[in-house]
Amino acid sequence: MNSPNQNPRPIVIALGGNALLQRGQPPEVEIQKANIHIAALAIAKVARHYPVVVTHGNGPQVGLLALQGECEKSCKPYPLDVLGAETEGMIGYLLEQELRNQLPGRDVVTLLTQIVVDRQDPAFLQPTKPIGPVYTLEQAQQLAQERGWAIAADGQDYRRVVASPEPQRIIELPTIQLLVNSGALVVCAGGGGIPVVVNEAGGLQGVEAVIDKDLAAALLAENLQAQGLLLLTDIDGVYENWGTNYAHRFEQTTPKNLRRYRFATGSIGPKVEAACRFVETTGQWCGIGKLDQALDIIDGKAGTVVMP
């Protein structure tokens, strides 16, 4: 991997939703602030050595806003694209503030980001993206019946799932590139970006969906010609035979090797797919691992590093 002096192109860092709100934690602002403080410390360590662009998850937050909206009977619930924009602004604000505190004198910019999807994407007919809090099976079944939700298992719990179409084009890409070139640390494409389609008049129109943040991060990194992609989560890498006595972490591997295995669709699977796409398309590296090991992952000393 190149040093910042040799390669001024950015590293794109994608924060997992657990970096903002850990499983089982109440979604209170003070708790999220504390988690974001920890995340900002890790990002700042990288940003002192490399140009950085940050993306983040929003699953718990967008689900909470959806629940709050359904409790307000005086107006119709807001659609998911609007809720996604709200969370992108909220989380971006908290991240930007913490990063400015950690990197005094550094320009940090949060940018709402629209990402075009295909209105004919089959994902609209088969919801797979978990959002909101976790439920027991009984609770989830009751909510599905009352509110018309699709539900799916998420580990030992259950969550609401919504459509997650493939990201195709980033509307604000030229602006993001301009900000990166200026030396700013950019927070963008939060929660996978705001899903939009091109309507018959050639304009943009929001759609009810949540784009996978890791696939959006891979597209962003490819478009920015990033020197690397860093997918940070709460586990220390990608494992073969995860959850068994024969679990083995891939330290350095290739897309070809990873595609021989099946990974959980609701957790590590999207990260593996995003890593493979980015490496196959660009010939650059992608690291997957724990937030507090970010620099070690870049140096090949921790996590799973996917190489061409």
Would you name each region that the model predicts?
Residues 2-308:
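C-terminal catalytic "cap/lid" subdomain
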